[in-house]
Amino acid sequence: MALQPAAGARDLNPQQVELNQKLSQRLAEVYRLWGYDEVSPPRVERLETLKAGGAIASQDIVRLVADEPLGLRPEMTASIARAACTRLRQRPRPLRLWAAGTIFESRTADEGSLCIEENLQSGVELFGVEPINAEMELLSLLFSAVETLELSKQHQPRLLVGHTALMDLIMLPFQNDLREKIRTALIHYDRLALENLQLPNDQFERLLHHLECRGEPLDVLERLSGLFGTQQALNNLQRLFEQMGPLAADQGIDLQLDPTFQPHFELYTGLVFQLVCQSDAAPVVIARGGRYDNLVARCGAKGLQAAGVGFSFAIDDIRELLTKEIKASEAVESTLVAYGDQATLEHALKRQRHWHKQGQRAVVELEACHDREEAFSRLADRGCSTLDWLDH
């Protein structure tokens, strides 16, 4: 029998499970305050759904052996979008939904073998609202949710924002295969790849300018307006950042606009963003999201019905980031009910019920102790802070 979990699988201890639940509950309370209803999408879906119309690569999906092509969900947006366009299609828009659950990604390990990456997510989806109104609510909700996580300055939270329309503007002068090569180089911040394309000097310098055109959103928008003139996407972003700037400043979140930023999954057809924090070892993405109208349209929606935005939090990564803070602020008091030779286990169990009726966590020591001192010495091992000693 194998004594280690599969590579990439999560094998959480009780404390980690408890912290995950606390984080999920905090976020769920915020979602409910904003009028979002909980749904529970299936872990197993048809591959056609999981691929999201080609937006998610086959190699990112964990496939199952079955009579029909099935896989484990690498994210929950596609499944929720399908439900919104089928079972929930008669519900009025805006349609506000939230979900929490495990996702599974297939990845290649360092030695070249395939393994499963298992993660807990919590997030929201908003259907039936056009730009930029949906994005205004979505990011406002994001900031409200982040506030409950109580990030500190040492985490250096930064919201990185992009927009597919900005990348389209940059790509306008280029065609076909060259267009895709340039796009890939910009997304990966690969100057060498751009040099190897041997573009005319003016085009190369312009692309380098776009590559370096990132930073404070309003400054970047001013520079982009000078290059591309009046554009609806730029106007929408201007309005969005004017609204989000004060909210971000209140929470110490740095806003950064990057015209070449595009996420790993090609779901998005508008605003895209990710929230990055600094851990002890390296930067970590704790939330990501954006607009995915094309995905909703592929599920059969038409017109304004084919509009969707959403985001998700990476609960496991947030837990690792905040473990020390949560442990220090939310330690739970627990009582150890122990008994000596003059009492019995039955007495201890009855006493335990007394504590439980008061809503107090209580654990029974199942073997009799010689004396109070022995019982007291077992407190730490049992995870308890106080002793209830029975000896008569």
From Swiss-Prot:
Heteromultimer composed of HisG and HisZ subunits. Its main location: cytoplasm. The keyword Calcium does not apply. This function is generally fulfilled by the C-terminal part of HisG, which is missing in some bacteria such as this one. PROSITE patterns: AA_TRNA_LIGASE_II. One of its GO terms (molecular function) is histidine-tRNA ligase activity. It comes from Prochlorococcus marinus (strain MIT 9303). This is ATP phosphoribosyltransferase regulatory subunit. NCBIfam families: PRK12292.2-1. Belongs to the class-II aminoacyl-tRNA synthetase family. HisZ subfamily. It comes from the Bacteria. Transmembrane segments: none annotated. It is found in: Cytoplasm.
